[in-house]
Amino acid sequence: MVLTKAEISDYLFHKLELSKQNIKDLVEIFFEEVRKSLELGESVKLSGFGNFYLRDKKQRPGRNPKTGEYIPISARRVVVFKPGQKLRSRVESFKDIKKEKDIV
């Protein structure tokens, strides 16, 4: 299953009883703020959920799998997500529940 912005908006629409346009704008503004912060090189910390931060990767050697030719992979900056403890705990407990159901 994939959770989309449209599904988030629909869920919030039913929970908050605001107009669909206001909810859509709210979701869009939230994600735009996350994007802007990361573009500026800032971390995004969402308490109880996790942190988004940037990691600089150095140039490294790579290989074209079709030709076998060695090519350099250029240095770049990537976005990394590190889940918070609460999120990790919930995911782990869900995994344990699913494992118990599979055993039965």
Curated annotation (Swiss-Prot):
Heterodimer of an alpha and a beta chain. This protein is one of the two subunits of integration host factor, a specific DNA-binding protein that functions in genetic recombination as well as in transcriptional and translational control. Keywords: DNA recombination, DNA-binding, Transcription, Transcription regulation, Translation regulation. It comes from Buchnera aphidicola subsp. Cinara cedri (strain Cc). The keyword Transcription regulation applies. Belongs to the bacterial histone-like protein family. The gene is ihfA. This is Integration host factor subunit alpha. It comes from the Bacteria.
